[in-house]
Amino acid sequence: MNKKLFTQIKNEWRSNLWLITELLLVSVVLWYIVDYMYVQTSIYNEPRGFDISHCYLVQMGRLTDKSADFIPNQTDEEKRQDVKELLSRLQHRPDIEAAGLGQNSYPYNGSNSSASVVYDTLRSPGWTIRRLVSPDFVRVFRYRGTRGETPEQLAEMLKHPKNFLASDNLYKRRYGCDLTSLVDKQFYLFGDTTNTYNLAASLQVVRYGDYFEAWNSYCMVAPMPEEWYDLGTELCVRVKEDQDRDFIARLKADSEKLYRVGNVFIADVRSFTDIRRNFQQSHTNAWNSYLFGMGFLLLNIFLGLLGTFWFRTQQRRGEIALMKSLGGTDHSIFVRQLAEGLILLAVATIPAIFIDWNLANSELNAWMNGTTIE
């Protein structure tokens, strides 16, 4: 049977050549689709390096001179103390686990600042995110160190003004060096070569967002001077796990009585679940469009192949009837047809693998971890 099957395939080489070409194109397209979907899914599921569950952004406002409660002629120091006092009151609220201030620091934030982190001849990438924060900020989003440091331990480290934290992958791409090996070393920050800062801990990589790769996400975290405490900073809180229900409504209800400090008041409260959704809406829409488009393409490929083999079978009805008259069973005929299709697919797969490899080698497919071949 095998010999007859190969002879038949050879004799029908013209029609089989078209079928092999179709299978070749389908194989290449399917590989490209599967590769893209795998890469995007893998990136989305990478560890984020932070946790926004039970977290809220508290937006501050300041009374104007049109308000009867406005306090005029406040000094800059008094304004800073008002913000500091509001932070302290929130930290002591029973349903809040942690509260902290940051500048361009919270997750899913479109506003960024960058900083240089230099050790000897090692220099951080130009897009290293600078996060200036109060110590408890890392407790709010549960940052963790690569050597097992807890958020509480990291917060203690940030109480020293000369300590800082940074992503473990900061020098990995350029120099192949993990930052863990440089903990407790002295660094230059912010382009200042007259002062040194101590790397207190190396952080598990903090990603910029769910659709951004971990390997390309860099950040450094340093204590924010109290002189910078003002309305432009971001006040973030984490509530206890059983206190999420109606937290925003409860906090707003208490805000006028308990959280009006000087001219500073709570203007709005937003859940980080909403912030995350809004920040990533365009990425999510693009991802859904890709899913729909690729699903539609896969359906067309499936129907096209099904139609091709159905049409091929219809053309060979006479041949199938002859095989049955010569003693062939439905099972044996089905196995023969299936074997022929698998042989043609195997023939098409060989050049398809070659094409796929060259596409990847030419960096024309999806990237992950800085490469198209992993």
How should each PLM-predicted stretch be described?
Residues 1-12, 86:
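A short amphipathic helical element positioned immediately N-terminal to and/or at the very start
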Residues 40, 58, 90, 96-99, ...:
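Generic structural signal for small/hydrophobic residues in well-ordered secondary structure
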Residues 34-125:
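Membrane-proximal extracellular/periplasmic loop immediately following the first transmembrane helix
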Residues 43-50, 355-374:
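Short juxtamembrane loops and helix-capping segments at transmembrane helix boundaries
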Residues 161-162, 168-169, 192-287:
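"Rare, low-scoring activations can occur
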